[in-house]
Amino acid sequence: MAKDMTLLWGSGSPPCWRVMIVLEEKNLQAYNSKLLSFEKGEHKSAEVMSMNPRGQLPSFKHGSKVLNESYAACMYLESQFKSQGNKLIPDCPAEQAMMYQRMFEGLTLAQKMADVIYYSWKVPEAERHDSAVKRNKENLSTELKLWEEYLQKTSGSFVAGKSFSLADVSVFPGVAYLFRFGLTEERYPQLTAYYNSLKERPSIKASWPPTWLESPQGQDMLKDV
Amino acid sequence: MAKDMTLLWGSGSPPCWRVMIVLEEKNLQAYNSKLLSFEKGEHKSAEVMSMNPRGQLPSFKHGSKVLNESYAACMYLESQFKSQGNKLIPDCPAEQAMMYQRMFEGLTLAQKMADVIYYSWKVPEAERHDSAVKRNKENLSTELKLWEEYLQKTSGSFVAGKSFSLADVSVFPGVAYLFRFGLTEERYPQLTAYYNSLKERPSIKASWPPTWLESPQGQDMLKDV
């Protein structure tokens, strides 16, 4: 089955990482994997554009079925391989509701993170304002405090209850990215505990960004968030 | 079942409308519905904040289960009431893949729409730039042309294939919002045909924004997009 699958991905990208974690969790490791370089602009190559007119990674294919949106690929894989590997959507209605709620709140977290980390990359120099940088950091901090509360209530190991789920698949890569960019452990103890606990999970370890392994030192952009 | 459900919503809001369409499609019309006013700031009321710390609409509850993210509520309702009303996730793997892909691409469409329509509301006056307004409009136009192509390929009635699905639930309210804000029919014939066809669907008619019925005249903000 996995031999029919092709994933084009970039190292460190949270959306790519989500798909890779699900492929690990569902025992679909035999997929065709191709690491591309954002720095070299390979996400705009003809190979990517033919699968993904947006020129983005991940670009994912199962046979002739194209699923480039990371949430779409994750939902599809869980649905098609429900009884293979680990179950990623809980049956219990209360746990399932919490899982969907946190999974989609994860998009807001990702957005507020991107507003800070990609600011200089996304906003042309003539349109940049210190006031916007400050506000984006405050918004990210407010968002992160909400997740601190959520994790306190679930007592820490998983983001939506008692078991690893698509909510963790969606949220963990962003959390790791935040720490990679200098989030301070002292200010976010629950997120730190969550990060430290999940980074040892086999599916996550196996898909850890190779560029992070090569140069373990991250950046300090978020040290004052 | 639906009597255990409460939806706090605002008229015209695409995320609120998504949940209302699913409730109609799944024959759950007996839910407790409370229309709140964004203009009066009722989305920041104590009632909303107690269900939704983000102070946003929709705020949705099924018993004690809270699902405020519209995509989360839609996924949950389809999962819990699979065999009730209309099936909103196709079984066929190819159709399902397309459905998830379009559903999540819908978030990008919503984002690019928001970047244009909410610009003055979101960006403080001292940080506004004509160049950003122009770029946002161009990005929205590029995005809409992609959807024109998608609709051409599916031959128009539904956004992800042969039947109405969660992809339409996710995308249609945004399309209606675009036309409400002045998108021109001449430039987007496929989106226009899609809009005209789906606006007659019973679930959509029954949940049409009451403020739009009261004052049918929209705005012309998008006339040059």
From Swiss-Prot, chains A, B:
The record's annotation in CDD domains points to: GST_C_family, GST_N_family
- Report any one BP term from Gene Ontology: glutathione metabolic process
The protein's job, in short, is: Conjugation of reduced glutathione to a wide number of exogenous and endogenous hydrophobic electrophiles.
Listed name of the protein: Glutathione S-transferase A
EC number(s): the record gives 2.5.1.18
* Domain GST C-terminal: start-end pairs: 92-217
Family designation: Belongs to the GST superfamily. Theta family.
Q: Tell me the SUPFAM superfamilies matching this sequence.
A: GST C-terminal domain-like, Thioredoxin-like
Record-level GO cellular component terms: mitochondrion
Location of this chain's protein in the cell: Cytoplasm
**Binding locations of glutathione:** 18
Instruction: Show the catalytic activity.
Output: RX + glutathione = an S-substituted glutathione + a halide anion + H(+)
Instruction: Give one GO molecular function term.
Output: maleylacetoacetate isomerase activity
Q: Subunit arrangement? A: Homodimer.
Q: Where is the GST N-terminal domain?
A: 3-85
Keyword terms of this UniProt record: Cytoplasm, Transferase
Report the induction information.
Answer: By epoxides and by antioxidants.
Which EC class does it fall in?
transferase
The record's account of tissue expression is: Found in all the tissues examined. Highest values found in liver and in intestinal mucosa.
Lineage of the organism: Eukaryota, Metazoa, Chordata, Craniata, Vertebrata
Q: Which organism is it from?
A: Pleuronectes platessa
